[in-house]
Amino acid sequence: MRSPPDGYTLLLLNSSNTINATLYERLNFDFIRDIAPISGLATFSFVMVVNPSVPTTTLPEFIAYTKGNPGKINMASAGSGSTHHVTGELFKMMAGVEMVHVPYRGSPPALTDLLSGQVQVMFDATPSSLPHIRAGKLRPLAVTTATRLEALPEVPTVGDFVPGYEASSWLGFGAPKNTPAALIDRLNKEINLAISDPAIKARLMDLGGLVLSPSSPAEFEKFLASDTEKWARVIRTANIKPE
């Protein structure tokens, strides 16, 4: 972000940026102030998956079971303050359930323990869990986006049962602040043209759960501010601290 604003340095942004803006109190930059938004790229849903040993097959059953068995459900994540974690904490807050958070150093070890039954539930990136869902090794209860996924059309959304719930991970492009508006507009058009390629769309669908999300610079700027505010509320309410 300290690079010259000449259009030759682009930043690949993701959900961690809007989470870390609140999670880390002493960053040496201001994410919103120091970025010139260019365009959204893609979003992907998380899927709420449980080990098949959990005696529930639907989200309402899981909520009822969790409320009736306090302290019994362990929720894995890729680490304290990870997208997996805050997505789960948002669910806990909105569904009114208590789950024990078990942070791991990354998604792979968390998924390994979920598959073995050491933990019971995880909000995982759909591309990561999809092979295990198709193999019957994990049971999907819901996806976290506002609409169902083409990759998992039979799986409902969390919002179907917890009104107002929506969460997703995302990718987008930015540039150093003060990059000329004409350059930002040109980059926006070129990026949106590239991701409209049918081959790129097909490849993203093959990964499972990814949806292209092109936008104007103004739309992406508004999204970044909204997403930062959303996760700030969750982090402060749940008192999440970085590891």
Language model region names:
Residues 1-5, 90, 94, 108-118, ...:
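Short helices/loops that flank or line small-molecule/ion binding pockets
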Residues 6-13, 74, 120-124, 140-142, ...:
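Paired acidic/hydrophobic, glycine-rich loop segments that form the ligand-binding mouth/hinge
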Residues 14-17, 54, 79-81, 144-147:
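Short, flexible active-site-adjacent loop segments at beta-strand->alpha-helix junctions, enriched
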Residues 17-26, 90-94, 121-154:
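A ligand-binding cleft/hinge motif common to bilobed small-molecule-binding domains
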Residues 94, 134, 179-243:
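An extracytoplasmic/periplasmic, membrane-proximal ligand-sensing/linker region
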Residues 101, 123, 213-214:
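A short structural motif in glycosyltransferase catalytic domains
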